[in-house]
A protein has these predicted regions:
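Conserved phosphate-donor/acceptor-positioning beta-strand/loop module used by diverse small-molecule
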Residues: 67-89
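Conserved nucleotide-sensing/catalytic segment adjacent to the nucleotide-binding pocket
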Residues: 1-65
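Conserved GTP-binding G-domain of TRAFAC-class P-loop NTPases and closely related GTPase folds
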Residues: 83-134
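Short C-terminal domain-edge/linker segments immediately following a structured domain
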Residues: 28-31, 79-80, 105-108
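Small/polar loops that bind or transfer phosphate-bearing groups
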Residues: 50-51, 77-78, 125
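Short glycine-/polar-rich loops that comprise or flank the Walker A/P-loop
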Residues: 45, 69-74, 117-121
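Conserved nucleotide-binding/hydrolysis micro-motifs of P-loop NTPases
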Residues: 3-5, 55, 79-84, 129-132
Length: 134
């Protein structure tokens, strides 16, 4: 829900003063808005692109529910180790708690087998194999 958070004027104002506090203040409101938009799309049968870390056990049930609504799910997982993610965050000059990076990675690795059983199509991409200095 990064794009939603970054579009909020309150986040932008807070970010200009202190990026860590801006993240801590606006992450949950952005997440709330993101899930509301997802629900709106599902209720209206819209095509949906849901970009997320998928590091939440609740997403197993979410994807099952989405499938029950007749949606096909195509999941693309970007294989990026916590070390790679932390480097990228530093280059983006965007705050995200480092301890959460590892926590999310561990959760995602644990959930991937379940996701692979649910989704219609699963792709694991490793862009770092073809690009230098990620």
């Amino acid at each position: 829900f990064d794009a939603i958070m970054e579009a909020l004027s309150g986040y932008q104002a807070d970010y200009s003063l202190d990026r860590e506090n801006a993240f801590l203040r606006w992450e949950l409101p952005a997440r709330f808005l993101g899930y509301r938009l997802l629900l709106l799309g599902l209720r209206n049968g819209w095509p949906i692109l849901f970009e997320h870390s998928n590091a939440l056990r609740e997403h197993v049930d979410l994807y099952k529910k989405i499938k029950s609504l007749g949606y096909r799910i195509h999941m693309v997982c970007i294989d990026a180790t916590p070390e790679m993610v932390i480097k990228r965050l530093a280059r983006r000059n965007r705050f995200f708690p480092e301890e959460q990076v590892k926590k999310r990675w561990d959760c995602l690795i644990d959930l991937l087998p379940e996701y692979q059983k649910i989704v219609d199509d699963f792709k694991l991409i490793q862009p770092w194999k073809n690009v230098e200095n990620l």
